[in-house]
């Protein structure tokens, strides 16, 4: 366990101009990197374009939508196929929170999950080992979910804790209460410092909201007029240029400041599988459901392991490593309910 953490938390070497094409998959990612690492002031417009690309608000053509659904069919339509793939294997559930268990809302402090969704997740955790993997800090996501029997991976997997009580799977761990993984602890003072600087720097931009998620800082621009995105990008860049050990990633109308370490939601998934005793098992079937770019790290891990599958929550066609799709949290709940019903029937409950 300790070796797993040590091998995956080394600082990433500072990237140079000799970087291979494989390291950057899109021009937009390259533009973002140039702005943050190379102080590319002239590329702010490209960054804003990338912000738009990460926050789709318009319908794609029906032809493109149809083509995308052919490659990433509905997990509800393909439910029997998913069950067939999992036959004889232990299903382990990994769920993002915002946009997956709760709707995306303008005010991130009001991203409440419904009581019906909470009941569904509680039943799910009674059937399968279940983890919430979120960009929010553990304390915030727990205050939304309010289920002690789950595993929680906050701050994009940089803060992991086991269930406090009630999970029938906690016996798998030698001592689930001691399960704790915080690979970025040394960055806490730096993250806190950047948080306060970003609050001060962005206060002139109406609608901007800076959130301290313990091991990362989120700059929400969902309520920022698009005409002001460029100003906000400049404000964030002016702070980030003084912190080469931090990196910036993007999500659905949010900019995320994180330590440059080899740790993400994919690493969190692997850590939890190892903690549960499934690291080298062939009879385990991880199911990861998420809606954001940061969930792609977990989708890619599952593809590389050739084990389990990813389900993207999106109404719009997106480039993704997920195998299936669901359109919104209501569909996620229906999928989870069907999983629970299937398991209960199999168990004779």
From Swiss-Prot:
Summary of the function given for this chain in its UniProt record: Removes the phosphate from trehalose 6-phosphate to produce free trehalose. Trehalose accumulation in plant may improve abiotic stress tolerance.
Protein keywords: Hydrolase, Stress response
The protein's required cofactors: a divalent metal cation
Catalytic activity: alpha,alpha-trehalose 6-phosphate + H2O = alpha,alpha-trehalose + phosphate
Native source organism of the sequence: Arabidopsis thaliana
UniProt xrefs under PANTHER family: TREHALOSE 6-PHOSPHATE PHOSPHATASE, TREHALOSE-PHOSPHATE PHOSPHATASE H-RELATED
Name of the protein this chain belongs to: Probable trehalose-phosphate phosphatase H
Regulation: induction: By trehalose.
Keyword presence, Glycoprotein: no
Domain of life of the native organism: Eukaryota
Enzyme Commission number(s) from the entry: 3.1.3.12
Pathway(s) served: Glycan biosynthesis; trehalose biosynthesis
Record-level GO BP terms: trehalose biosynthetic process
Coiled coil: none
GO cellular component: cytosol; nucleus
SUPFAM superfamilies according to UniProt: HAD-like (SSF56784)
Family listed: Belongs to the trehalose phosphatase family.
GO molecular function, one term: trehalose-phosphatase activity
Cited InterPro entries: HAD-like_sf (IPR036412), HAD-SF_hydro_IIB (IPR006379), HAD_sf (IPR023214), OTSB-like (IPR044651), Trehalose_PPase (IPR003337)
